[in-house]
Every structure is written in structure tokens, then in C-alpha cells.
Curated annotation (Swiss-Prot):
Keyword annotations: GTP-binding, Lipoprotein, Myristate, Nucleotide-binding, Protein transport, Transport
Residue numbers with lipid attached (N-myristoyl glycine): G2
Record flagged with keyword Secreted: no
Function recorded in the entry: May be involved in trafficking events within the endosomal system.
Gene, per the UniProt record: arrL
Protein name per UniProt: ADP-ribosylation factor L
Organism whose genome encodes this protein: Dictyostelium discoideum
Length: 195
């Protein structure tokens, strides 16, 4: 565990490549922990705390061709007023959920509804990470997909199990991001060529 973690899970992207990645979600869902797993130990001091609005900070870093930000969705208006420019500029949006906290599900659904309503995720791939799948009371992936109504999305999406404590699911999420980001960028480039 320590050897892999110290190097960081994110692979280095080819020269000239850049993937913009946003990690959002409710409090205590694992956003900062995931960010710290992604990067190597020596890069943690390079994480910047950026003030984006009065009293609202995001964590930001560029690492091996990945431009990452992570932030809490504390209030519904954060999406439309504060995070929208960051979300619209992202290739990938990871929405973190504590799958062991049933009370968080309703608020998570409200936030995802708002993301769809505000058209914040139309041009990105969208990944819901059901963290804390190691807990006995966790919600299953199928239950989560149905409750959040993820089938409404027209862009590439996936709901994956994750246990950051056990470091299970991180490699699967990175693999899915890489596969779907390449497909999405190719599709967007083809659309631009036709216009």
C-alpha cells in the first residue's frame, strides 16, 4: 500500500496532453482523500488552496498532465454561482458520495439535479464514486444509479464502487477516465470539424 500510495495513482500523460478533472461532492465524502491518493507524497505541498468566492476555497494542483480541483458542495447555489465556470471547463467530473450515509443521498440527488439543470456536465464525462463501500450499511451501485436517476444523462457516465480506506476501486476509476476522455475528446473534435 505505502509504495503505490507514495508514487500516486495517476499515470503521467503524454507530453502536450492535459485532462482537466473536477472532484466535487458533499462534506466528508472523500474528495480530499481521493486527491491525495491521486498524487505522489512529495507533491502534496504543491496543492494550492484557492479562494474562488467569499469564504469558498477549492484545492487545486497540476500533476503529470492532470489539472485537478476539488471542492465541497455545501449549498445548492454553489453550483450555479461559484463552481459552474470550473465545471464547464472540466473534461471529467467526479461526484463523490458517502454510500454508507443514507441521509446524504437526498442532498446528493438534489446537487446532481442542479448540475443537469444548469448544464454543467453536458460537455464532460461524469463519474459518480460510491465511496465507503467497505461499510456494512452502504448502498449498492445499482440502488445508487436508480435513486440518482443517472440514466437521464446523455454524456458518458458511470457509477463505480470505491473504498479509499482499502484503496479499492481507484485503478478502475482511472482506467475508466482515460478510456472515456479519449473517446469524448475524439467525438468533440469530430463535431468541431463538421461545423
Amino acid at each position: 500500500m505505502g509504495g503505490i500510495f507514495s508514487k500516486g495513482y495517476l499515470p503521467e500523460l503524454p507530453n502536450g496532453s492535459l485532462i482537466k478533472l473536477g472532484i466535487i461532492g458533499l462534506e466528508n465524502s472523500g474528495k480530499t482523500t481521493l486527491l491525495n491518493k491521486f498524487i505522489d507524497a512529495s507533491s502534496k505541498k504543491s496543492i494550492a488552496s484557492v479562494l474562488i468566492s467569499t469564504g469558498v476555497y477549492i484545492e487545486s494542483i497540476i500533476f503529470k498532465g492532470w489539472e485537478i480541483f476539488a471542492g465541497d458542495l455545501l449549498y445548492p447555489n454553489y453550483i450555479s454561482k461559484i463552481y459552474k465556470p470550473y465545471l464547464l471547463g472540466s473534461d471529467v467530473i467526479i461526484f463523490m458520495i458517502d454510500s454508507s450515509d443514507i441521509h446524504q443521498m437526498t442532498e446528493a440527488k438534489n446537487q446532481i439535479d442542479l448540475l443537469i439543470q444548469e448544464q454543467c456536465i453536458n460537455s464532460s464525462v461524469f463519474l459518480v464514486m460510491a465511496n465507503k463501500q467497505d461499510q456494512k450499511r452502504c448502498v449498492s451501485i445499482h440502488q445508487l444509479e436508480q435513486y440518482l436517476e443517472l440514466y437521464r444523462l446523455t454524456n458518458p457516465w458511470k457509477c463505480l464502487p470505491l473504498s479509499l480506506i482499502q484503496e479499492k476501486g481507484i485503478e478502475d476509476l482511472i482506467k475508466w477516465i482515460l478510456e472515456n476522455t479519449v473517446v469524448r475528446k475524439t467525438y468533440n473534435n469530430q463535431l468541431q470539424t463538421l461545423q
